């Protein structure tokens, strides 16, 4: 069904009314920018955020800057959906996503250089994930890119599942000081478009995830504590 409805013909039988495509597209990109940022702590209301983006207003605080960055990043992704997965692409997406929001501006668009990073429960502040050492990040990203750019894989993996794996692995490694969740979701969005799932542009993935954020976080946790069985994370995505 995903192949049929998300990647089917864009012609006259499309489920998107041709007369309203631009309106739907703009609305969807704005929604994605808002919800992805709000999941990471942006406190601006949807009404204020929409007005800022639609009127091209200058962001007035960090929350608005996060949403503005997310919107700019999505537009960049749409323009670069045919690119190969690379360290350069990942760093550029992170740079756009975190522009003017990092405690140290130099951390935007570069891998973390220490292990002073953990993933905490937002309420209890309990550590729920300790990422791999920063020393392993460059090689991990190189291996990830090589795997997903392989034109003749030994085993077929459905493109949607491959996109989910990219989402999970970037989140798991936490290659950046901040902005890992936003960047991981953006890379999933990019991969879906790259593989021809054009309807992704018209749907806010983060809005769907935000509605089930606890299940989203549990899917990460269950995967890690059960021998890195990514089936939990895949099942969550396919369900929502």
Language-model features: where?
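FIC/Doc superfamily catalytic core
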Residues: 1-240
């Amino acid at each position: 069904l995903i192949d049929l409805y998300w990647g089917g013909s864009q012609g006259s039988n499309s489920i998107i009314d041709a007369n309203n495509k631009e309106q739907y597209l703009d609305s969807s990109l704005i929604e994605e920018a808002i919800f992805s940022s709000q999941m990471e702590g942006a406190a601006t209301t949807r009404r204020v955020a929409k007005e800022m983006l639609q009127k091209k207003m200058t962001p007035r605080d960090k929350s608005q800057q996060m949403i503005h960055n997310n919107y700019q990043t999505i537009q960049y992704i749409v323009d670069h959906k045919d690119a190969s997965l690379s360290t350069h692409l990942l760093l550029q997406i992170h740079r756009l996503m975190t522009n003017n929001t990092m405690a140290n501006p130099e951390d935007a668009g570069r891998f973390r250089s220490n292990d002073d990073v953990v993933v905490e429960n937002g309420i209890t502040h309990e550590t729920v994930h300790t990422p791999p050492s920063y020393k392993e990040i460059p090689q991990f990203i190189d291996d990830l890119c090589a795997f997903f750019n392989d034109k003749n894989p030994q085993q077929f993996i459905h493109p949607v599942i491959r996109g989910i794996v990219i989402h999970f692995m970037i989140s798991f490694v936490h290659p950046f000081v901040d902005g890992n969740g936003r960047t991981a979701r953006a890379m999933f969005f990019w991969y879906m478009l790259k593989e021809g799932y054009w309807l992704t542009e018209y749907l806010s993935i983060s809005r769907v995830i935000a509605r089930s954020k606890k299940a989203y976080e549990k899917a990460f946790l269950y995967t890690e504590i059960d021998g890195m069985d990514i089936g939990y994370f895949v099942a969550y995505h396919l369900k929502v």
